[in-house]
Design a protein with these regions (language model features):
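Glycine- and small/polar-enriched repetitive beta-structure motifs of secreted/surface proteins
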Residues: 1-195
Length: 195
């Protein structure tokens, strides 16, 4: 290897790195497929397992937790913290997932923020589009599949939304019955919960 200033701890951690710099991989098979990606941090069992840049890209991915970012291959600027956080991401950019199972099924959607256990757990778009969804709270927006530009803050806020978009829900279970609606604003505990 000709890389510089890499820290690799654990069986198979950073195993394929050749000409990559400034990576940290700690845990079994963390960052083990990458050859040329630089400035990544993978901490935990299988964290950033399949990331593989072949062009020497500076990717700035951070994955901390068992299987966090496990399937990420070429995405950049992702922060994934928690067990299974961003587990299915493949070629997605600029995502933040913090919490167990946060943003766990998203493959291509970019510019998504999910904070809380199960937040945006089912989010998954079929193109590499920026969806601008934000969910903060336990299971907030956990059913959103292809909906875009939703802001959901509070435990279970917008938890039934699937394809709806441009909704704003603030408070426990706010907008929790809406599945496909657009342009709704719910403010307060259980606001528009039966809509």
């Amino acid at each position: 290897t000709t890389g510089a200033q890499n820290t690799l701890i654990g069986a198979l951690a950073g195993d394929a790195l050749t000409d990559a710099d400034y990576n940290t991989a700690i845990g079994y098979a963390a960052l083990s497929s990458d050859t040329l990606g630089s400035q990544n941090t993978a901490v935990g069992y299988l964290a950033l397992l399949t990331q593989n840049f072949t062009s020497g890209t500076t990717s700035y991915n951070t994955a901390v937790g068992s299987q966090a970012g496990r399937l990420l291959t070429t995405g950049i600027h992702n922060t994934l913290i928690g067990g299974l956080a961003g587990d299915a991401l493949t070629d997605a950019d600029s995502n933040t997932a913090i919490g167990y199972n946060a943003l766990t099924t998203n493959t291509l959607g970019s510019a998504v923020t999910a904070v809380g256990s199960g937040a945006l757990a089912l989010h998954n778009v079929t193109s590499a589009a920026q969806t601008f969804n934000t969910a903060v709270g336990y299971d907030a927006g956990n059913q959103v599949t292809t909906g875009v530009q939703n802001t959901l803050v509070g435990g279970l806020a917008g938890d039934a939304i699937t394809t709806g978009g441009e909704n704003e829900a603030f408070g426990y279970k706010a907008l929790s019955a809406n599945t496909t609606g657009f342009y709704n604003v719910a403010l307060g505990s259980r606001a528009l919960a039966n809509m």
